[in-house]
């Protein structure tokens, strides 16, 4: 849907009165570029009032730089009127002509305007350009609605291919599961029985003495008699 179609005649007439009142302001009585009297055109995205001759040069710059509207012949949107009211020639030139020499010769409007807006020759470094943020957002939303934009729904998870399934199955078989087992308990999930280690008791003192005596007796040898008996 065209946003201009939503502007009623009553609202359009109200916008015209507001713009005419803005043109009566001392800062807006002259063209923002060539200083000619009684401008009847404007750049809605730059927020400045310009004369008919300069409006033609602005159109040649492209709508990405300057969007030209007639004060009385075109339909204005509420956010465009609000931006013109908040900016105007004085505030606009504070940005575009910040470093312009005081007595600069503006003999050629075409060359001057292109250097001013396309090249940004006299803009201070780090300066922030006045911009109709609300207008830019509303235009983007309107463009999305007109183009039938629909938010994307989350896509389903991709199914695994045959090769991927085989690889995953192999990895699950090879990789040992991380389990926490306790001694003497049965892990019902893994069906693994852990046998506890037997406890070894220290032998008492009597057994130690007995074993030492036995070992000592084993080491003793039987001595032969001093004289061997002979038998006839």
Curated annotation (Swiss-Prot):
Gene Ontology molecular function terms on file: GTPase activator activity; zinc ion binding
Record carries keyword Hydrolase: no
Superkingdom of the organism of origin: Eukaryota
Region called Disordered, residue ranges: 203-232
A Pfam family: ArfGap
UniProt domain Arf-GAP: residue ranges: 16-130
SMART domains according to UniProt: ArfGap
Keyword Plastid in annotation: no
Alphabetical list of InterPro entries matching this protein: ARF_GAP_AGD5/15 (IPR044520), ARFGAP/RecO (IPR037278), ArfGAP_dom (IPR001164), ArfGAP_dom_sf (IPR038508)
Ranges annotated as biased composition (Polar residues): 206-232
C4-type zinc finger span: 31-54
Sorted UniProt keywords: GTPase activation, Metal-binding, Zinc, Zinc-finger
PANTHER family, per the entry: ADP-RIBOSYLATION FACTOR GTPASE-ACTIVATING PROTEIN AGD15-RELATED (PTHR46419:SF3), ADP-RIBOSYLATION FACTOR GTPASE-ACTIVATING PROTEIN AGD5 (PTHR46419)
Protein task: GTPase-activating protein (GAP) for ADP ribosylation factor (ARF).
Protein's name according to its UniProt entry: Probable ADP-ribosylation factor GTPase-activating protein AGD15
């Amino acid at each position: 849907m065209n946003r201009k179609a939503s502007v009623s005649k009553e609202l359009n007439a109200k916008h015209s009165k507001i713009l005419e009142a803005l043109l009566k302001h001392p800062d807006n009585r002259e063209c923002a570029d060539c200083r000619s009297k009684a401008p009847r055109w404007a750049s809605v995205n730059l927020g400045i009032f310009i004369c008919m001759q300069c409006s033609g040069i602005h159109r040649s710059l492209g709508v990405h730089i300057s969007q030209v509207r007639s004060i009385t012949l075109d339909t204005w949107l509420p956010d465009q009127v609000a931006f013109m009211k908040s900016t105007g020639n004085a505030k606009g030139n504070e940005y575009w002509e910040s470093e312009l020499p005081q007595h600069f010769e503006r003999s050629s409007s075409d060359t001057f305007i292109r250097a001013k807006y396309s090249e940004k020759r006299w803009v201070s470094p780090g300066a922030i350009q006045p911009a109709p943020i609300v207008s830019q957002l509303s235009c983007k939303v309107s463009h999305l609605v007109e183009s039938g934009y629909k938010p994307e729904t989350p896509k389903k998870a991709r199914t695994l291919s045959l090769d991927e399934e085989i690889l995953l199955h192999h990895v699950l078989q090879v990789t040992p599961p991380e389990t926490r087992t306790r001694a003497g308990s049965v892990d019902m999930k893994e069906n693994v029985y852990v046998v506890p280690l037997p406890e070894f008791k220290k032998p008492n003192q009597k057994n130690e003495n007995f074993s030492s005596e036995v070992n000592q007796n084993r080491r003793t040898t039987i001595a032969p008699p001093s004289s061997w008996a002979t038998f006839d």
